[in-house]
Amino acid sequence: MDQYNHSSLAEFVFLGFASVGYVRGWLFVLLLLAYLFTICGNMLIFSVIRLDAALHTPMYHFVSVLSFLELWYTATTIPKMLSNILSEKKTISFAGCLLQTYFFHSLGASECYLLTAMAYDRYLAICRPLHYPIIMTTTLCAKMAAACWTCGFLCPISEVILASQLPFCAYNEIQHIFCDFPPLLSLACKDTSANILVDFAINAFIILITFFFIMISYARIIGAVLKIKTASGRKKAFSTCASHLAVVLIFFGSIIFMYVRLKKSYSLTLDRTLAIVYSVLTPMVNPIIYSLRNKEIIKAIKRTIFQKGDKASLAHL
């Protein structure tokens, strides 16, 4: 049998959690709690924004789309990670690995585009307030959100196709906590310089270009805010952007170090740490950032809860 035929390599083995030892149970509980908090928090924000008419604005429309995206983003990796922590056989099929990698990168790219759209929305609201209602219509918001999803799901296709055609040897142990391009390419039996170059070009285009546009938007926002004469006006303008900027810095800060690099070898510890940040930590803190720092969402949550409570009370009368 040809040792370079990937059909002979039916599955991969994850070694990311192989050395957790006696802390396995605690790690499982912590990761499970983080996942449940992420699901519940993002579901709450998505539902409240959709149900409360006061939040039917472009800014909150994008926040709800981001919360919905985070639900699927975490679902591509964390359930399998939880299974691998408890299971003695930490495996995934060849096709399953490619699918996980594709959806993880598709949703990640979609988030990059969506965060850019949100920055543009804030730029229009603060720098061009008179034109904002005319430009940022409901139709445009829907089209921008759809474009973010579409472009995101198109971006990794070429990377996945190239990875699927690589020959893999008998060594099938992935030194990571989930399937991803860098650890997958390190297992190939041939030179992967072309793959690394393609990955770098696509990642650099998506990550650096979107991050650049976000920073340009915020540079103009800061310039406009500093021209506001009243302190209360400046504070209100900055508060509308603080949550989004915090999410941008956490998310982009980790993925830039992870994916915008031209090398095959990498630090396993650093990559696993960064993977935890952008696959677990960022989706988990999004609900905290957008709810605890946002009075409108807190008020909407209270209105939703009290309205349901009042309806339940009336139903029992």
Curated annotation (Swiss-Prot):
Gene3D superfamilies, per database record: Rhodopsin 7-helix transmembrane proteins
GO molecular function: G protein-coupled receptor activity; odorant binding; olfactory receptor activity
TM annotation in the entry: 26-46, 55-75, 100-120, 140-160, 198-217, 238-258, 272-292
CDD domains to which the protein is assigned, alphabetical: 7tmA_OR6N-like
Subcellular location field: Cell membrane
Topology Cytoplasmic: residue spans: 47-54, 121-139, 218-237, 293-317
Cysteine-cysteine disulfides: C97-C189
Extracellular face of the membrane: 1-25, 76-99, 161-197, 259-271
Chief location of this protein within or outside the cell: membrane
Pfam families, alphabetized: 7tm_4
Family of the protein in this entry: Belongs to the G-protein coupled receptor 1 family.
Function according to Swiss-Prot or TrEMBL: Odorant receptor.
Protein's recorded name: Olfactory receptor 6N2
UniProt source species: Homo sapiens (Human)
